[in-house]
Design a protein with these regions (language model features):
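The feature captures the beta-strand-to-loop junction immediately N-terminal to the Walker
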Residues: 33-35
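Helix-to-loop junction immediately C-terminal to a conserved catalytic motif
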Residues: 48
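Conserved ABC ATPase "signature" region
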Residues: 94-109, 159
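Conserved ABC ATPase signature
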Residues: 113-117, 121
């Protein structure tokens, strides 16, 4: 579960979030929608502990996986190793990483390094790594941006399957993406989400 109570966040004199309160129940799938620059990414960065708000409280109950808007991969690791790095040691780890790569259509990229991959391929690997890491809460910041329609459908199906029954918080501009992955949508309005 995620509870946000009267959160305020500013960048200098510009207030981005104003008395924002939100409750995301365990196991629910929630989308945050709004115009660019309204504070969607800032809010999930606060939830992830990457930003400190000016005031208010955030409570996160559970282990969090986060897929950033821009893929963050280790440049010295291959695609499969970027996934494998979050798995505990054991004989099942490599097959799990390979299974996830296959599920997003990247088996042939197994041994490639991030600099050899397109932006969409990197994003799919970042999603695979978050799924491999597991946890109770998945934060997704524009995860399907830049993917073609077939790949978007493939990745959406994987997210629904792998994250069934767990909490998902999605930031998106795309209503069809929100509809595909979430059962509730909050829209930005005057510094908060309603």
């Amino acid at each position: 579960m995620i509870t946000i109570d009267r959160l305020t966040l500013s960048y200098g004199r510009q207030q981005v979030l104003k008395d924002c309160s939100l409750r995301v129940e365990a196991g629910s799938r929630v989308a945050l929608m709004g115009p660019s620059g309204c504070g969607k990414t800032s809010l999930i960065n606060v939830i992830a502990g990457l930003l400190t708000p000016d005031s208010g409280k955030v409570s996160v109950n559970g282990k969090v996986s986060y897929v950033f808007q821009e893929p963050a991969l280790f440049p010295w690791l291959t695609a499969v190793d970027n996934i494998n790095v979050v798995l505990s040691d054991g004989p099942e780890t490599l097959p799990r990483a390979e299974q996830l790569l296959e599920a997003v259509g990247l088996s042939d990229c197994r041994d490639k390094y991030p600099h050899q991959l397109s932006g969409g391929q990197k994003q799919r690997i970042a999603i695979c790594r978050a799924l491999a890491y597991g946890g109770d809460i998945l934060l997704l910041d524009e995860p399907l941006k830049g993917l073609d329609a077939d790949t978007r459908d493939q990745v959406s199906a994987l997210l629904r399957k792998e994250w069934a029954g767990k909490t998902l918080l999605l930031v998106t501009h795309d209503p069809s993406e929100a509809e595909s992955l979430c059962d509730r949508v909050y829209r930005w309005q005057e510094g908060t989400f309603r």
